Amino acid sequence: MKVIKTLSIINFFIFVTFNIKNESKYSNTFINNAYNMSIRRSMAESKPPTGTGASGSAGSGAGASGSAGSGDGAVASARNGANPGADAEGSSSTPATTTTTTTTTTTTTTNDAEASTSTSSENPNHNNAETNPKGKGEVQKSNQANKETQNNSNVQQDSQTKSNVPPTQDADTKSPTAQPEQAENSAPTAEQTESPELQSAPENKGTGQHGHMHGSRNNHPQNTSDSQKECTDGNKENCGAVTSLLSNSSNIASINKFVVLISAKLVLSFAIFI
């Protein structure tokens, strides 16, 4: 009799411990699955967009290249604006050589003033010398006037070329004071070219840092908030999946408890009657 009682008690404890282990396993697995599903949904909804900083930097680079192009255009316009003056001077002096004979004068608006003045001054003079042998003195005077205009235009071109040509090594060695002046003149241009990049850089950096900090701080709290919003906003499907798993685990736990109570009653009844 005592042996049966002890065996029944041992079986009861074994059964209880087995049911408790099974209950803990089922409950843990269901809870973990529900938590993982909620985390995956919240992560899928809170993916931050990428590729914002790159476009800003590209825009700043395009602005720098546009400013460089405008500088070249200004130099070209300055050169073209200075040379037509010499062409106008050369062409204004040519009508003095025209006589009663009809001569065609062609004026070309090129950058070289020598070609325009030579073509417009030499050809009419030869025609005048052949057709008017009597007026040689006038032709000589006109030739002298044309030579003076050519010399003036050549001097202007030389001055322009000297101003445009960079200083050679001999000039640098002879005048050491020219180098610091050139460095000072080049410094403000470098500052001007760097200024648009500096103006556009802090905005891009600020937005990039703000986006990264915002994403890193709000990843974890958004998980819980999104899982709560799914149930509160009326998304019954998402909320139902989580609650169904939890309800299944609770039902299994209640069934295990009921089985344990029944087995305990049976063991006690056998022990009492025996």
Curated annotation (Swiss-Prot):
Residues 53-72 are annotated as: 2 X 10 AA tandem repeats of G-A-S-G-S-A-G-S-G-[AD]. The keyword Protein biosynthesis does not apply. Residues 91-121 have a biased composition (Low complexity). InterPro entries: MSA2. A lipid is attached at N248 (GPI-anchor amidated asparagine). GO terms for cellular component: plasma membrane; side of membrane. Residues 122-131, 140-167, 174-202 have a biased composition (Polar residues). Residues 1-20 form the signal peptide. Residues 44-200 are annotated as: Polymorphic region. Residues 249-274 form a propeptide. It is found in: Cell membrane. Residues 43-234 are annotated as: Disordered. The keyword Membrane applies. Sequence repeats lie at residues 53-62, 63-72. Keywords: Cell membrane, Disulfide bond, Glycoprotein, GPI-anchor, Lipoprotein, Malaria, Membrane, Merozoite, Repeat, Signal. Glycans are attached at N22, N36, N151, N223, N248. It comes from the Eukaryota. Residues 53-72 have a biased composition (Gly residues). Disulfide bonds join C231-C239. One of its GO terms (biological process) is cell adhesion. It is a lipid-anchor; GPI-anchor. Its main location: membrane. May play a role in the merozoite attachment to the erythrocyte. The N-terminal region appears to be involved in lipid binding. This is Merozoite surface protein 2.
